[in-house]
From Swiss-Prot:
Positive regulator of YopE. This is YopE regulator. The lineage of its organism: Bacteria, Pseudomonadati, Pseudomonadota, Gammaproteobacteria, Enterobacterales. InterPro entries: T3SS_chp_SycE (IPR005416), Tir_chaperone (IPR010261). It comes from Yersinia enterocolitica serotype O:8 / biotype 1B (strain NCTC 13174 / 8081). One of its GO terms (biological process) is protein secretion by the type III secretion system. Transmembrane segments: none annotated. The gene is yerA.
């Protein structure tokens, strides 16, 4: 089983970033235009999240269509924070499930999800069935 510090060290090595001298409880990584945050929450889970900036024309129903079930446990989930009502895109995985590529894949899927959300105004809402 990896520790949070070992997981962050491995991810930074894969991203060719300098490893911080002190690994804080929440680590930030900039990927393209997205600030991605990584923490251990709850204990034993690697949580990654970003705060996507969404166009005001996006309706929550359309955005929530991205939350459809998936076989991939790393697929990001869109939520709204309780305090400010801002969108939060997040995913997580158990520390004991990590392998050499799973953190990189988790970060990649988070960024891809954020990119899709920014273009969601081009996506029509799901059809309703009667």
């Amino acid at each position: 089983m990896y520790s949070f510090e070992q997981a962050i060290t491995q991810l930074f090595q894969q991203l060719s970033l300098s490893i911080p001298d002190t690994i804080e409880p929440v680590i930030g990584v900039k990927v393209g235009e997205f600030a991605c945050h990584i923490t251990e929450h709850p204990v034993g889970q690697i949580l990654m999240f970003t705060l996507p900036s969404l166009d005001n024309n996006n309706e929550k129903e359309t955005l929530l269509s991205h939350n459809i079930f998936s076989q991939d446990i790393l697929k990001p989930i869109l939520s709204w924070d309780e305090v400010g009502g801002h969108p939060v895109l997040w995913n997580r995985q158990p520390l004991n499930n990590l392998d050499n590529n799973s953190l990189y894949t988790q970060l990649e899927m988070l960024v891809q999800g954020a990119e899709r959300l920014q273009t969601s105004s081009l996506i029509s809402p799901p059809r309703s069935f009667s």
